[in-house]
């Protein structure tokens, strides 16, 4: 089974992430940031990952450290669960619409962290959630999962829809990339022989 549990404790946050890459989309989310929980739910449901997140942080200051550190810890959990990457598809992509909004996410388990994030949010907040924290979440994920990630919101008016389509597309692209390819069961998907 491709499962992992990772704990991250700093002076700013205490986070535990439990992940099953071959799950059914079950989730138990308590990040302390309600909108982040809503977005993590999208990743779990659309990625078909079993995901538990428990976090406490210095949200009395703002949500930045918690959101970023959940991204970091999730990235570490994915890297741990995926192991040596033998047999994975490696690449994943998804387009997801929601009413007027359309987003595209493309991922590569290259071992080279890189993020291209192009989301022209139409407002600064969704409820109390600062949409600038979205890029911090994904930057933390990318740097600790060791992936190249391209995120593009192609159109949208509603900032909630922009966020939601990004997270849904991310879950679906991640699912595709970590899917095991039975034709390549014991091989690394790279001409270098390593990722």
Swiss-Prot record:
RNA-binding recorded as keyword: no
Cellular component annotations (GO), alphabetically ordered: cytoplasm
Catalytic activity, as annotated: D-erythro-1-(imidazol-4-yl)glycerol 3-phosphate = 3-(imidazol-4-yl)-2-oxopropyl phosphate + H2O
InterPro entries given in the database record: IGPD_sf (IPR038494), ImidazoleglycerolP_deHydtase (IPR000807), ImidazoleglycerP_deHydtase_CS (IPR020565), Ribosomal_Su5_D2-typ_SF (IPR020568)
GO biological process, one term: L-histidine biosynthetic process
HAMAP family: HisB (MF_00076)
UniProt name for this protein: Imidazoleglycerol-phosphate dehydratase
Organism: Cupriavidus pinatubonensis (strain JMP 134 / LMG 1197)
């Amino acid at each position: 089974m491709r499962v992992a549990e990772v704990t991250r404790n700093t002076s700013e946050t205490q986070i535990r992430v439990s992940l099953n890459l071959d799950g059914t989309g079950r989730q138990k989310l308590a990040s302390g940031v309600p909108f982040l929980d809503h977005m993590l739910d999208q990743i779990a449901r659309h990625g078909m990952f079993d995901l538990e997140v428990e976090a406490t942080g210095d949200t009395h200051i703002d949500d930045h450290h918690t959101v970023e550190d959940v991204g970091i810890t999730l990235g570490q959990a994915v890297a741990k669960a995926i192991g040596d990457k033998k047999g994975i598809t490696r690449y994943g992509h998804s387009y997801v619409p929601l009413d007027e909004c359309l987003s595209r996410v493309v991922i590569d388990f290259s071992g080279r962290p890189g993020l291209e994030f192009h989301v022209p949010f139409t407002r600064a907040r969704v409820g109390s959630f600062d949409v600038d924290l979205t890029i911090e979440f994904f930057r933390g994920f990318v740097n600790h999962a060791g992936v190249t990630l391209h995120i593009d919101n192609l159109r949208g008016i509603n900032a909630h829809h922009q966020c939601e389509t990004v997270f849904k597309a991310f879950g679906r692209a991640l699912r595709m990339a970590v899917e095991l390819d039975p034709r390549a069961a014991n091989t690394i998907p790279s001409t270098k022989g390593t990722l």
